[in-house]
Structures are given as C-alpha cells and as structure tokens.
C-alpha cells in the first residue's frame, strides 16, 4: 500500500540490536545518535516520498541519547524534524490516564497531536468507553483501532490526509 520498495536499512539512521531504550542501546553498542545524521537521513527520505511516517520509540519522553555531550529525548527529534504526532496506545485498562498525560505533555511542550490510534483493540464496554473518554478529555480524535493480528490500518483517507497537514 505504501509503495516503499527500498530496504528497511536505507530508511533508518540507527538500528540497535539490544531491546532497551535507545540511549542505553547506544551506550552498550557504542553508536550514539547524532541529530545531524537523523536530520540528513530524514531529508533524503522525504525527497523520495510524498508522505513520511516516523515511528517513535518508547514514547515522547523516551531518551534517545543521554551522555556527557548530549541529552536528547524523542520530543527533541520531533521538534527538529517539525513532525506532527499521533499517539499510539494500548486500548485496555489504564489507557485513559496514559493517553491524557501523553497528550498534555506533547501540547505543553509545543507540539501538535493529530490523532490517537488504539492498539490491541477488541471492543467491548471498557474499550469503547476508553475511546469516548480519551476523545472527551483530550479533544483529540481516535482515528483508528488496531485489533490483534490486523495487517492493515482501517482509517478514512481524509482523516489520514489531515494527519500530514
């Protein structure tokens, strides 16, 4: 659907082998994130595609690099690249609090939230209420729900276009 034909490695600035926070993986593997590299790689990919989605790692407050030279959070990368944000959250118990706090953090730090996607969505009273409460408390629409095993994202094309505006 996306029409991407190149290797994943050509779309990534950094890919760590250790399944830990990026700052820790970088320290373990001796390959810290350089923001100029990230910016150059993003600009290169953006020239090739009309729409580019950047997947975050660990949430907006995730440390990307944290050492004597630099203290970089994911929010710094989002701001540097002038990205809009989508919040992806588990649909289950505890998500109202987690999503509301995440949206407030993003807004309070000068970024825009374009939508919310609920992951591991199975429906039912709790998850349906979670969705309604999240929209009510944040004013941000839930634009999609992803069920376990889904291979495609069901989202209205006009809604998706607004994410990239």
Language-model regions: role of each:
Residues 1-32, 36, 41-44:
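N-terminal phosphate/diphosphate-binding loop that engages ATP/GTP or pyrophosphate donors
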Residues 38, 42-70:
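Switch II (G3) loop of P-loop NTPases
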Residues 53-55, 86-88, 117:
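Structural motif
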Residues 57-58, 92, 121, 149:
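Anionic group-transfer/hydrolysis microenvironments
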Residues 66-75, 100-103, 127-132:
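Charged helix-capping and loop-helix junction motifs
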Residues 67-91:
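Inter-motif core of Ras-like GTPase G domains
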Residues 104-165:
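C-terminal lobe/tail of nucleotide-utilizing enzymes
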């Amino acid at each position: 659907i996306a029409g991407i034909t190149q290797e994943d490695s050509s779309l990534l600035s950094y890919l760590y082998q250790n399944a830990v926070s990026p700052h820790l993986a970088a320290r373990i593997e001796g390959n810290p994130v350089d923001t100029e590299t990230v910016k150059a790689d993003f600009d290169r990919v953006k020239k090739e595609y009309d729409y580019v989605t950047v997947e975050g790692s660990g949430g907006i407050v995730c440390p990307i690099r944290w050492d004597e030279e630099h203290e970089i959070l994911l929010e710094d990368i989002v701001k540097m690249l002038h990205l809009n944000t989508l919040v992806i959250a588990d649909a289950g118990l505890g998500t109202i609090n987690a999503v509301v706090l995440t949206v407030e953090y993003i807004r309070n730090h000068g970024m825009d939230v374009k939508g919310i996607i609920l992951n591991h969505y199975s429906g039912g009273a709790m998850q349906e209420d979670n969705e309604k409460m999240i929209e009510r408390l944040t004013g941000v629409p839930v634009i999609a729900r992803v069920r376990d095993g889904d291979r495609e994202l069901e989202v209205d094309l006009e809604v998706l276009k607004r994410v990239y505006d």
